[in-house]
Regions:
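Short alpha-helical elements
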Residues: 1-230
Length: 230
């Protein structure tokens, strides 16, 4: 995770000198535990048992593009980065602790692409961890300003604090917006920077969505364990 080295370059002899363990075996079990949901269950359990250590006075929503060098599932050309990328939507708490994420989407799509499905995935993990979403204040930038998203949040009784996008041209209806609360949105930038400290997540080399997602669950867990000092 930290060095981002290739699977075949794992330093196994230094740690398992008395046993014969190959990088193929390590990857086999990583893939197996990714596909059977083990890393997701670990993350849900950590959240469930340490909810009091989260700051849910507000949550922050944002998308993040990661360059992909090897292609694979949900990879597409992103003009702003002039490269192939994968986009993921993340949710963090008011301290910058990542909470949940949606499935990767191809880089050519904007943050609102399949937003209903993405939000269901994000909220679904919180529900599984017995974290109540009703009444949460959610900050999001103008890229998320859409009637569809606002309606979804309203139905879930989540208070969306979304910066208006002037290009939408919808000035007839006054929308709730708290500028002071919105200043907390920088925490998602902090959270993404912490993820980028893992070189395995800085550039995407995993071709399968399932292994890419579970590398993130592993990173979420490592960062949270450091925070709560278990």
């Amino acid at each position: 995770m930290k060095t981002g080295c290739q699977w075949r370059e794992l330093s196994l002899k230094e740690y398992f000198s008395k046993e014969t363990i190959s990088w193929q075996l390590v990857y086999y079990y990583f893939s197996k535990w990714s596909k059977d949901g083990s890393f997701r269950r670990i993350w849900i359990s950590l959240l469930q048992n340490n909810k009091r250590k989260l700051d849910l006075s507000s949550v922050q929503l944002d998308g993040s593009h990661t360059r992909s060098k090897t292609g694979g599932e949900s990879v597409g050309y992103q003009g702003r980065k002039s490269s192939n990328t994968t986009n993921c939507i993340f949710l963090c708490d008011n301290q910058g602790q990542m909470l949940s994420m949606g499935k990767p989407i191809s880089g050519e799509h904007h943050d609102l692409y399949n937003i209903e499905e993405t939000l269901e995935e994000i909220v679904g993990l919180l529900d599984a961890a017995d974290i109540e979403v009703k009444g949460l204040f959610l900050n999001a930038d103008s890229g998320f300003d859409s009637k569809k998203l606002r309606d979804i949040l309203y139905k879930k009784e989540i208070i969306g604090n979304i910066k208006e996008n002037p290009r939408n041209g919808d000035t007839k209806n006054e929308k709730y917006f708290d500028n002071e609360l919105y200043k907390r949105r920088f925490k998602i930038e902090k959270a993404n920077a912490w993820l980028d400290s893992f070189k395995a997540l800085l550039i995407r080399f995993e071709t399968l969505n399932v292994t890419w997602i579970n590398l993130h669950y592993l990173a979420f867990s490592i960062l949270f364990l450091r925070k709560i000092k278990v």
